[in-house]
Amino acid sequence: MTGSTIAPTTDYRNTTATGLTSALNLPQVHAFVNDWASLDMWWFSIALMFVCLIIMWLICCLKRRRARPPIYRPIIVLNPHNEKIHRLDGLKPCSLLLQYD
Protein backbone atom coordinates (compact mmCIF):
# COMPACT_ATOMS: atom_id res chain seq x y z
CA MET A 1 0.00 0.00 0.00
CA THR A 2 1.72 3.06 -1.15
CA GLY A 3 -0.43 6.08 -0.20
CA SER A 4 -2.97 5.94 -3.03
CA THR A 5 -6.33 7.57 -2.58
CA ILE A 6 -9.59 6.32 -4.01
CA ALA A 7 -11.26 8.87 -6.22
CA PRO A 8 -15.01 9.36 -5.74
CA THR A 9 -17.15 7.80 -8.45
CA THR A 10 -19.64 10.65 -8.52
CA ASP A 11 -18.97 13.80 -10.48
CA TYR A 12 -20.95 16.41 -8.55
CA ARG A 13 -20.53 19.03 -11.27
CA ASN A 14 -22.82 17.06 -13.57
CA THR A 15 -25.53 16.31 -11.02
CA THR A 16 -25.83 19.71 -9.36
CA ALA A 17 -26.46 21.46 -12.67
CA THR A 18 -29.67 19.50 -13.16
CA GLY A 19 -30.87 19.69 -9.56
CA LEU A 20 -30.15 16.04 -8.82
CA THR A 21 -28.37 15.67 -5.49
CA SER A 22 -28.10 11.89 -5.37
CA ALA A 23 -24.82 10.33 -4.28
CA LEU A 24 -25.11 7.77 -7.08
CA ASN A 25 -24.06 8.39 -10.61
CA LEU A 26 -27.14 7.74 -12.75
CA PRO A 27 -26.25 8.58 -16.34
CA GLN A 28 -29.69 7.70 -17.71
CA VAL A 29 -31.41 10.17 -15.34
CA HIS A 30 -28.80 12.80 -16.09
CA ALA A 31 -29.25 12.32 -19.84
CA PHE A 32 -33.05 12.43 -19.54
CA VAL A 33 -33.07 15.67 -17.57
CA ASN A 34 -30.65 17.35 -19.94
CA ASP A 35 -32.36 16.03 -23.08
CA TRP A 36 -35.79 17.24 -21.88
CA ALA A 37 -34.65 20.83 -22.31
CA SER A 38 -32.56 20.24 -25.42
CA LEU A 39 -35.32 18.38 -27.28
CA ASP A 40 -37.79 21.26 -26.81
CA MET A 41 -40.17 19.10 -24.80
CA TRP A 42 -41.60 22.05 -22.86
CA TRP A 43 -44.72 21.96 -25.04
CA PHE A 44 -45.47 18.40 -23.90
CA SER A 45 -45.79 19.51 -20.28
CA ILE A 46 -48.17 22.31 -21.23
CA ALA A 47 -50.23 20.01 -23.46
CA LEU A 48 -50.46 17.41 -20.70
CA MET A 49 -51.64 20.07 -18.27
CA PHE A 50 -54.41 21.19 -20.66
CA VAL A 51 -55.51 17.60 -21.26
CA CYS A 52 -55.80 17.06 -17.50
CA LEU A 53 -57.78 20.29 -17.11
CA ILE A 54 -60.21 19.30 -19.86
CA ILE A 55 -60.73 15.85 -18.31
CA MET A 56 -61.37 17.38 -14.88
CA TRP A 57 -63.84 19.88 -16.40
CA LEU A 58 -65.73 17.09 -18.17
CA ILE A 59 -65.94 15.05 -14.96
CA CYS A 60 -67.36 18.04 -13.08
CA CYS A 61 -69.94 18.71 -15.80
CA LEU A 62 -71.06 15.08 -15.89
CA LYS A 63 -71.39 14.94 -12.10
CA ARG A 64 -73.50 18.12 -12.05
CA ARG A 65 -75.77 16.88 -14.83
CA ARG A 66 -76.30 13.54 -13.10
CA ALA A 67 -77.05 15.18 -9.74
CA ARG A 68 -79.82 17.42 -11.10
CA PRO A 69 -83.34 15.99 -11.14
CA PRO A 70 -84.76 15.69 -14.63
CA ILE A 71 -87.18 18.38 -15.74
CA TYR A 72 -90.44 16.51 -16.25
CA ARG A 73 -93.80 18.16 -16.76
CA PRO A 74 -96.51 15.67 -17.59
CA ILE A 75 -99.55 16.77 -19.55
CA ILE A 76 -102.65 15.64 -17.65
CA VAL A 77 -106.19 15.77 -18.99
CA LEU A 78 -109.10 15.19 -16.63
CA ASN A 79 -111.89 13.15 -18.11
CA PRO A 80 -114.95 13.19 -15.82
CA HIS A 81 -116.85 10.44 -17.65
CA ASN A 82 -114.77 7.45 -16.58
CA GLU A 83 -113.11 9.11 -13.56
CA LYS A 84 -109.59 8.46 -14.75
CA ILE A 85 -106.72 10.81 -15.37
CA HIS A 86 -105.60 10.52 -18.98
CA ARG A 87 -102.02 11.36 -19.58
CA LEU A 88 -100.92 12.60 -22.97
CA ASP A 89 -97.26 11.75 -22.36
CA GLY A 90 -97.69 8.01 -22.91
CA LEU A 91 -97.63 6.84 -19.31
CA LYS A 92 -100.33 4.66 -17.76
CA PRO A 93 -103.45 6.45 -16.56
CA CYS A 94 -104.06 6.47 -12.84
CA SER A 95 -107.48 6.34 -11.21
CA LEU A 96 -108.91 9.50 -9.71
CA LEU A 97 -109.51 9.00 -6.00
CA LEU A 98 -111.44 12.22 -5.38
CA GLN A 99 -114.98 11.95 -4.08
CA TYR A 100 -117.58 14.32 -5.43
CA ASP A 101 -120.07 15.98 -3.09
From Swiss-Prot:
What is the recorded post-translational modification? Answer: Glycosylated by host. Palmitoylated at cytoplasmic tail.
One GO cellular component term of this record is:
host cell nuclear membrane
Q: Which residues are glycosylated?
A: 14
The membrane-topology field of this record reads:
Single-pass type I membrane protein
- Positions in the Extracellular compartment: 1-40
Q: Which GO terms describe its biological process?
A: viral release from host cell by cytolysis
Pfam families given in the database record: Hum_adeno_E3A (PF05393)
Q: Which residues lie on this side of the membrane: Cytoplasmic?
A: 63-101
Where is this protein chiefly located? host cell
The record's subcellular locations are: Host nucleus membrane; Host endoplasmic reticulum membrane; Host Golgi apparatus membrane
Give the source's domain of life in one word. Viruses
Alphabetic keyword roster: Early protein, Glycoprotein, Host endoplasmic reticulum, Host Golgi apparatus, Host membrane, Host nucleus, Lipoprotein, Membrane, Palmitate, Transmembrane, Transmembrane helix
Transmembrane region positions?
Answer: 41-62
Q: What does this protein do?
A: Promotes the release of progeny virus from the host cell nucleus by accelerating the lysis and death of the host cell.
User: Belongs to which family?
Assistant: Belongs to the adenoviridae ADP family.
Q: How does it assemble?
A: May interact with host MAD2L2/MAD2B.
Which protein are we looking at?
Adenovirus death protein
Species this protein is from: Human adenovirus C serotype 2
